[in-house]
Regions:
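Alpha-helical transmembrane bundles and membrane-interface segments of multipass inner-membrane proteins
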Residues: 1-183
């Protein structure tokens, strides 16, 4: 079992935060391009009848559910961001926890990317559309959230052992009572 190794190095902070900012900037840049090149235009076919770029102003969540619930999404996003910052603060820069940090970078960048849209546009710009399966239109931030969530489940199901998860629990919730065995 590893111990909390103390402060994260400057390099660690730079990799995490610059990585997150780069992902966020990529998301915002693609949305900017979608607004300029796709808005009020016919969809652009990338692969005929399979995949196209189609502008959509999504005022809901994934798949367009919960339309017009901006306050709800803002509050949920703020709560989620608090959780990410808490995890970042509590977990050590231990190599074993790097997959958690990568997951957090993806989830943070995706959540903030769509949060920015909701705050400044009152909708989220979506533009990727898989026609072949009529999949709901999505964006780069949605890809980050999906990949981050998938990585989270893969890591916690196939990589981490019970001891690792228990140690993370102790690091994240230090006020939690110990059981009768002192664990």
């Amino acid at each position: 079992m590893s111990q909390n190794t103390g402060k994260k190095s400057l390099v660690f902070h730079l990799i995490f935060w610059l990585g997150s900012v780069c992902l966020l900037l990529l998301d915002q840049w693609t949305k900017y391009l979608a607004c300029i090149h796709l808005k009020d235009r016919i969809p652009v076919s990338v692969i005929e009848d399979v995949f196209c770029l189609q502008y959509l102003e999504n005022r809901g969540a994934a798949f367009g559910i919960l339309q017009g619930q901006k306050v709800f999404f803002v509050l949920i996003t703020l709560l989620f961001l608090f959780l990410v910052f808490w995890i970042y603060h509590c977990l050590p820069a231990d190599r074993r926890f790097y997959p958690v940090y990568v997951t957090m970078m993806l989830l943070l960048s995706g959540a903030v990317g769509n949060f920015i849209d909701r705050i400044f546009r009152n909708y989220v710009v979506d533009f990727f559309y898989f026609e072949l399966i009529n999949f709901p239109i999505f964006n780069v931030a949605d890809i980050y959230v999906t990949c981050g969530a998938a990585l989270f489940f893969i890591v916690f199901i196939f990589v981490y052992k019970e001891e690792d998860v228990n140690e993370m629990g102790r690091l994240l919730f230090p006020w939690k009572r110990k059981d009768k065995n002192g664990k």
